Amino acid sequence: MAKRKNITTTQLALMTAAAVISLRGLPMMAQEELTMFFYIFFATFLFLIPAALVGAELGSAFASKGGGVYTWVKEAFNKHLGFTAIFLQWIQNVVWYPTVLGFAAASIAYMIGMPGLAQNGLFVGLFSIAMYWCATLVTLRGTSAISGITSKGFLIGTVLPGIVVIVMAVIWMAGGNPVALEHIPDTVSQVVNIDAAHHVHPRLFPHITGMSDIAFLAGILLLFADVEVHAVHAPELDKPQTQFPRAMFLAALISFGLFTLGALAVAIITPYDQINLQSGLFTTFQIVFDHYHIGWLSNVMGLLVAFGALAGVMSWISGPSRGLLWTAQEGVLPCFLQKTNKNGVQVNILVIQGCIVTLLSSLYIVMDDVSVAFFLLSALTVGLYLVMYMMMYAAGIRLRYTQPGLTRSYRVPGGNAGMWAVGGIGFLAVLFSFIVTFFPPSQLPVGSPATYTWLVVVGTLVFLSMPFIISFAMDRRKGANTTGSGK
């Protein structure tokens, strides 16, 4: 038998960083100015690292069974909760698509030299719908070109523009240009402090008068999600027990560095009132490139970022839904969802997925402010994902007691107490962030806070109830079939 090819600590760290890092979050963090350090620290040390460590133990324990989070939660509790976990992982990804497609729409708007389109809800909505269905059609064909596109997307569409914006910020400051961080309006009390002499200074810790002042925490947390996707590779390390924590801390350091430097670059160049959640990065490019009379580079950056965003959609469009296909083949979902085409692609699941994305993308069209729609979708996405993470932490703790003899090539250090500490900290951080998602951010013109909260609550409840309704319906159908067979 051929020897398995192991991966190195650095390779796993880079794989994890690639799954986590996205440029679309830079404007959101930049709006927090220097208080971004509080949010990034919270997301890195109370979410990213605990999720990676617990995910690694679960992934190494059930690597041979497959099914990911479905298997982890099913083994800890039951198949209904396992299905709920994989369903939430899938549906949050479905809700995520309109946010990244909205970001791609803004990229295209700047690429064609019409930045105003980035705030045109009709353009953003129709672009998101059209691009998603195009990506779905390509996925259904099973073309080999997809792998090449997605492998280059991170490097060309994320790393390169990220480095460019950081370098341009350094050049901007070295040239003696105004630093936007030093000219924040005194009305933004969450991120500035006014001393006795009425001088305005950026805060390092957010001024919190209510949950709305830290509502961006939920959206920032989402930027650090998906680390558990690569936790299953822990057994492929030569020494998982020592190498995996090092890989995760290295990935956390890379993510912390790129997110922090990139967001700082946006905050340094772009005036506070021009930082837009969806198109703030491109405003930064436009300001700095126009200043140095190379405005055409804004179009180039728009093209690169759009390529990276669309490549990201194509890389995820089939993957998470395969988890649902796996549960369908186990009889947890209706038989028609088991259908695959000649390329082995789960066609019916992707069609349903596309219909949901179309409906959610329509929010850009019907809502007055594109940024509010963008953040609303982000809040709904992170709320669903955080519930799945709570289930994952609970599964990790419970399995230490229900299956203590289970072979784990990687274990969270410190015995059961260590698992309680890591899993408990992660669970509490996620629970707090989940509560925050229901509060509208004070930094955005949401109009009616009650309407915003109502939309998030209803959307979360609808998607949370769906796996239970499906499980109940499938159990009733099986019961009816069993009774019918007995007659």
Regions found by a protein language model. Name each.
Residues 71-72, 78, 110-115, 188-203, ...:
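TM-loop-TM module centered on a large, flexible mid-protein loop between adjacent transmembrane helices
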Residues 158, 167-170, 375, 380-388, ...:
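A generic transmembrane alpha-helix motif of multi-pass inner-membrane proteins
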Residues 37-38, 118-123, 152-302:
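Helix-loop-helix junctions that connect adjacent transmembrane segments
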Residues 1-56, 64-66, 184-185, 405, ...:
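Membrane-interface "cap" regions at the ends of multi-pass membrane proteins
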Residues 4-13, 94, 122-129, 238-242, ...:
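Loop-to-transmembrane helix boundary motifs in multi-pass membrane proteins
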Residues 31, 49-140, 306-326, 370-383, ...:
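Hydrophobic transmembrane alpha-helices that form the core helical bundles
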Residues 3, 135, 152, 337-343, ...:
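C-terminal membrane-solvent junction of multi-pass transporters and transport-like membrane proteins
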Residues 123-189, 225, 248-252, 378, ...:
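Membrane-interface loop-to-helix entry segments
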